[in-house]
Amino acid sequence: MKKLTSVLGVALIAFSLNVFAADAPEMGTEAEAQTMSESAATLVNEKGEAAFETFADAKGDFQKKDLYVFCMDMEGKMLSHPKKPELVGQNLRDFNKYGDKLFDNMIKLAETDGKGWVEYKWPYPGTEDLKAKKSYIIKNDKGFFCGVGAYVADAPADEKPADKK
């Protein structure tokens, strides 16, 4: 009987872990983010802003796992954001809620190198915990840039946004 109880206890723990894992969003990798960003740049170079409709398709190739494409002009105006369309048209260059001026840093990178990684903190999906995230951005032939962000694997949680001074 004691052995049966132990086996049932282990099975219950394993089941619980699987249930919690099933609730967690599937996360994209940095390599997947870079590949998606490169594909987005190619599409924008071919179609211009008409590519935004393709980026908005939740069942398409530009929204996989937690990855999606966003686009911004060189002044900081959000041009396309499939997950938060209310941001489109807003100038976010001075956004600094988490202390890292991520959009200003993206613009500076697009102006100087044309492409690369920008690191920042962002709330992890379903929580208020800040985690390390990186976006791979590429300035396209049309004069703006697009990017795709991925959470850094195994990065520790930082403080909650309310804790930031």
Question: For each of these PLM feature ranges, what is it?
Answer:
Residues 2-165:
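N-terminal membrane-sensor/transducer module of prokaryotic signaling receptors
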